Structures are given as C-alpha cells and as structure tokens.
Amino acid sequence: MKKIFIFLILTVFFACLKIIPLDWLQCCYVTTSKYSITKSRRLPSIADNMGISDADFLAETISKSVRFNPIQSKCKFHLNLGQTFITQNVTNFKNMSRKTQMVSHIVDYFLWTNQSSCQISHYFGGLLVSSAAGIVSMDGQKAICLDPIVAPRPYRCIVYSFGINYEWSFDDAMDLYGCKVFSFDPSMNVSNHRRNEKTIFYQMALNDVDKNEWKNNIGIPSRTLSSIYNMLEPIHGQNVIIDYLKIDIESAEWIVLPQILKSGMLDKVRQLSVETHMDFNEDVEMCCEQAKIIHLLEDYGMIRFDSKPNIYSAINLPQRKSLGFEAYEIAWYNYRVSHVDS
C-alpha cells in the first residue's frame, strides 16, 4: 500500500512538471533562449525557487519550446527561461480585454526581480527624498551584483554613468569603491571637467547616432556608446570591459538600447542598469514594443537580478484595477562577460 501511495505521489509530481508552461503562461509566446538551457547560470536558482532539487531534471523537462497564445494581439512576447514564471499570479485572462491583458502582462514583466540570480546584491548611492504626497524613500540608488564572478573589482573597475542631473551620490559611491567613473549629462550647465582624481564629467548625450547637437543645442555633442568608448580609450585603455553601465536618460533609453545591441557594445559591458519610462495611459502598443526591447537584452544574455518601481511614477491603471508604475529601475549582469579567473 505504501509503495502504491509513493507511486501515485510521484506520478502527480511529474505530471505537474509537464504542465508548468501551460499552467503558468496563459498569455505568452514562450521559447527557450538562444543559449542552451542546460548551460544557463540561472537554472539552479530557478529550480530552487520551484522546490526542485535537480536542476538538470528541470532543464530536461522544459528544454522543448512551448508556444501558447490565447491572446490574438500584436503584443506577443518571446520569453526565455528566466522569464517563464513572471505571470504566475495573473488569472482570469479570458475575462479581460486585450488592452487589460497587455497592461497586466507588461507590468508583471517589469516588476519581475529574479533576485535569486545574484547571491550578493547591494545598492550604491541614493538620497532620501519625499514626494508632495508625503511618500519618503530612497531615490537614485543603483543595484550592483557583488558575486565574485561578475562584481566590479575595486581599483580595477570602470563605470559609465549617463544621467546625473546634479545628483552625484551613485558616481561618488563608485569612486569610493575604487572605480574610474566617467559621468555624462547634456542637460547640466556644466562644462567638461575632472570632478576628482577618479571621476571625469562630460557634457555629452548618449544617442543612437553621432551629432554635434542635443535637442537643438548646438555645441553639446550626442554620441553612440561605441563612439564614446573609442573616445575614452586613451584614458581607460583599449579593449577594456565597462564594469557598470548606468543609463538614466528620461525615455531616451528606448532610442539608444537597440543601437547598443546592434553595435555589439554589450560584449564590453559586465553589468547594466537602466531606468525605463513608459506611458500606459497614452499608448499601450508602444509600451509593448518597449517591453520587447527589454526582452532583447535578456535574450542576448543579460541576466536580470534586480527590478524596482519608481514610486513617484505611480499611476492608477483602470485596466489592472490597481496602482501601477511607469518607471522601473532594472539591473542585469552579463553572463558572457564574467571573470574567467574567478
């Protein structure tokens, strides 16, 4: 009798594993990522989150591509292994409108933290600020994964920081950590200068093309990431890795991120932080396209380890019947650019 009971339990267990994609992913296109699932660095943490002790068994179970899409819309996400669990708490899709489904899916995707992919994560910088509504929180801090295989190495690290707005807490924190910091902001009324021994400021914009103007301001240059990297090679050396790339450029991220991907510059970036900005009430289809850009980063191999909403971007989302956020701070590390000697 005991053996029969154990057999039944195991049968149910394996049956549940086989239906995980259909049960949890009711509104997505789901396929494995371009790199092998069996070699994914995220697999052990994902298996642990699911209560599965054998990560190889999990890989074998979901190694085949699964496509399931009851929503006939233009918003079809092509998600990889790490993102297959983001919609597990979203239900009643059949009773929602297409716009509702899109908004809920996008919000869940951006809220997904995947924090288990980094054992030691720490925030650098940030100031305590309060809103007109009396909400008090930290703002300006950036998450950095300090796991030895991807952590910036003190006194041997390089940081590119785009978007300062006179708030230097992150840049100063990375300076204290021991990194060479290159700070950029075209909107500040400050010319190029050396802020201290390890930090240099440039009145320059990050763009998808090289121009000698920024928003019709002649004389303030706009440059691609690859052009900026080439400009700085005499200072930080050739073929070096950017240990941390911070991008906080008020919606211009949607212009520069595709160009960075296309240029191959992510091969030179170890960790990336982007503050994303969307407008759900204005154009949901555009938000969907923006979410696809984030997925392209992750399909390339950027491993998300932190995501938090900017509480000052909170809005009422009638489609979701709850508060939502239009700005998110997301951080990734690049598993392709790990410390090989760690």
Label each region the model flagged.
Residues K2-S342:
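Phosphate/nucleotide-binding beta-alpha loop and adjacent structural elements of enzyme active sites
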